[in-house]
Amino acid sequence: MILPVVAYGHPVLKRVAEDIEPDYPNLQQLIADMFETMYHSEGVGLAAPQINKSIRLFVIDADPFHETYPEAKGFKKVFINPEIVEVSEETWTFREGCLSLPDMNEEVVRPSKITINYLDENFVEHEEEFDGIKARVIQHEYDHLEGKVYVDRVAPMRKMMLKNKLRNISEGNVAVDYKMIFPNKKRR
């Protein structure tokens, strides 16, 4: 089932998400719905807060990046209760977008390599190191679990310049091809 994506300004995007347990109701269906929503919205990642669920879960399929970044081919994963435990000092700047901030892309500086502990969809524990585009997509989705969106990482002056655009998104004054929930949409 395709779920609506919450837009910038929604309170759930500012909350630190809660850990989940193996008995979380209908978890496998939720994961399937998140992948379906992500594909329908043409995203490469989707975090549970983006579908109005404040839980520590995100899904990734970075395959659309594989022509530019061959290591992204077939990179599809589920991350439950993740924790980034190490980041490199080396950074990488990349223009990011987000399903909760449609029609926007901004340069974001992030560590180029990370180590992350997480549970997969079967609650099997993993500790893995990722770099490049894989690390980038993981960090972007992880931020959603920490109550952050990528514009929180842009320079303060640049964020001020985006104020009107961000307000328009939160009010629903943006064209999108997928279902969204706009927190400040004006009733007419």
Where are these regions (language model features)?
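Active-site rim/adjacent substrate-binding subdomains
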Residues: M1-Q139, H144-R188
